[in-house]
Amino acid sequence: MKKNPKISLIGSGNIGGTLAHLISIKELGDIVLFDVAEGVPQGKALDLMQAGTMLGSDIKIKGSNNYKDIEGSDAIIITAGLPRKPGMSRDDLISVNTKIMKDVAQNIKKYAPSAFVIVITNPLDVMVYVILKESGLPHNKVIGMAGVLDSSRFNLFLAEEFKVSVNSVNSIVLGGHGEAMVPLARYSTVSGIPIPDLIKMGLSSNENIEKIIDRTRNGGGEIVALLKTGSAYYAPATSAIEMLESYLKDKRQILTCAAYLQGEYGIHDLYVGVPIIIGTEGVLNVIELQLTKEEKALFDKSVEGVRKLIEMVK
């Protein structure tokens, strides 16, 4: 019988629990649900496995407070850390979540140095950088969940604007995973038709698309303000699963993620949201889009914001 991949989820909060549920439904692999809070991962694991009996899923889920249980993981998704509360920016979380990431990274280095790692913890672009530097893993095996989520928000708002199925919409959001992200209307399409062409056809306006771009930039903040007690978790978890599946099944999908750049887009030693190809070796390729002067200026501004945050943890 073929052995299931081992997937460890570091952090058993809302995103961690949702990830485990999705992995179980899709039967992507056996799960270790880790958390420092005693009883929480164990309780969720039991609940999820009981749900699995009705779903016909034989996936094994183990709740743990011991990092040794992640030993030999094929993939790891990190959600540990404080979530955003109303009035907090992603950047306010830096100092406390950096300490948590350093601890997580040391344990990955010790127990699962061959794993493919996806980071979700905010501020994303900084946390994924800390994981890379502290774990010693190769850069093609450490990525951040950013653009997949931002693009999903952009896709939804565009589908609503054009009154079409979300399946017909493809969009790209570049840059840092924050308010300076760069949703690219020119590279976004409805059934292959670029947004600027649809505007020329009279199906929308530049003004409406700009409003959608602003709403996309504040997509996470909008949910934080409504929830009042935390941040989004269904869409972030689903976005990470898309990335995980491309890795485990060697799908070689092009997904926008926070990837480590070494000269691409003229950027060195930074994690920035760009389109990449994810396969069984991790990041196979970085796709370099040709940007207009205006797009490049917005992208550079977003990158500069990431660079300033990184300086705070160096």
From Swiss-Prot:
Substrate binds at residues 84, 90, 122, 153. NAD(+) binds at residues 11-16, 35, 97, 120-122. Its EC number is 1.1.1.37. Keywords: NAD, Oxidoreductase, Tricarboxylic acid cycle. The active site is at 177 (proton acceptor). It is an enzyme of class 1 (oxidoreductase). One of its GO terms (molecular function) is L-lactate dehydrogenase activity. GO terms for biological process: lactate metabolic process; tricarboxylic acid cycle. It catalyses: (S)-malate + NAD(+) = oxaloacetate + NADH + H(+). Catalyzes the reversible oxidation of malate to oxaloacetate. Belongs to the LDH/MDH superfamily. MDH type 3 family. This is Malate dehydrogenase. The gene is mdh.
